[in-house]
């Protein structure tokens, strides 16, 4: 029997800021239990890994290939219940603020 996918899981809205050029990225990731900062840090590490391994022309990955990992700061913007709500807030934040490293910008 297939398990029903959970819709009530906590999701983290996070911001990555390049401290050299001031450019930033907003994203979401699923929380691992209540370890919010740890979950966001894992997602940041995955971004770094993909930026090195994949030849994506996404603004964030281009920026990461041009800079050392140490120039990036990670901030938790919010923790919300449910993926749909997290996506909705992410889209609203991207529209409202100048997140230069989001490829949708």
Describe each model-derived feature in a short phrase.
Residues 1-105:
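Structure-specific nucleic-acid interaction/processing domains
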């Amino acid at each position: 029997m297939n398990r029903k996918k959970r819709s009530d899981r906590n999701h983290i809205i996070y911001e990555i800021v390049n401290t050299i050029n001031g450019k930033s990225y907003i994203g979401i990731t699923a929380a691992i239990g209540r370890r919010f900062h740890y979950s966001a840090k894992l997602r940041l590490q995955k971004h770094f890994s993909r930026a090195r391994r994949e030849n994506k022309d996404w603004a964030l990955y281009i920026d990461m290939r041009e800079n050392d990992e140490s120039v990036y700061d990670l901030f938790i913007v919010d923790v919300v219940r449910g993926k749909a709500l997290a996506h909705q807030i992410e889209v609203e934040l991207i529209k409202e603020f100048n997140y230069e490293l989001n490829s949708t910008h």
